[in-house]
Amino acid sequence: MSKNQLPSYQVVADEMKMATLAVTPAELHGLLAGLISGGLSQQDQSWQPMLFDYTNDGMGWPSAALEQAQALFNVTSAQLTSDEMVLNLLLPNAEGEEAIFALADALSDWVNHYISGLGLAGAAFNKASEEAKEALADLEEMARLGVDEDDDLQEQAELLEQVIEHVKACTLLIHAEFGAKTSSSETPTIH
């Protein structure tokens, strides 16, 4: 897995299942992204006890699952702090008619856990800009969206892709306001 590439959804799902952790990859990624967007830096390891409390009644995770979470944290932090403004969400990549329902459910889980992560990190939305408040309101609305099985599934799939892109934009906007800034040591020195 490269520095900015997420692991596959199924790999993370299998690891969580083996560790008997009741958290989906989408929930885990959303929570970590929310913690990072809420102000935790990549060097801040306080996310681990928060993760344990939130997902496992305060009990630590098995080392393989924690390594998977650490890698996911690192990739997510790298994406959110990159100048490229690209964020990938860890969502299922299934095929077939039922895939759209699984994707919509996973997106809702991602967004709900992202919002929880913002809260756990202590993001002060009462002092936020209007844009950040609007982005949070949009996320709260998108967390309640679903797919209507009676509607045209192709049209629903296209709309869901637009919603996913809007979730990414809202996440990047919120991170730009609340997220930890990258250290200036990465800036080249001029002699």
UniProtKB/Swiss-Prot annotation:
Protein name (Swiss-Prot/TrEMBL): UPF0149 protein VV1_1551
InterPro entries registered for this protein in UniProt: YgfB-like (IPR011978), YgfB-like_sf (IPR036255)
Family named by the database record: Belongs to the UPF0149 family.
Species per Swiss-Prot/TrEMBL record: Vibrio vulnificus (strain CMCP6)
GO cellular component: cytosol
SUPFAM superfamilies xrefs: YgfB-like
SS bond list: none
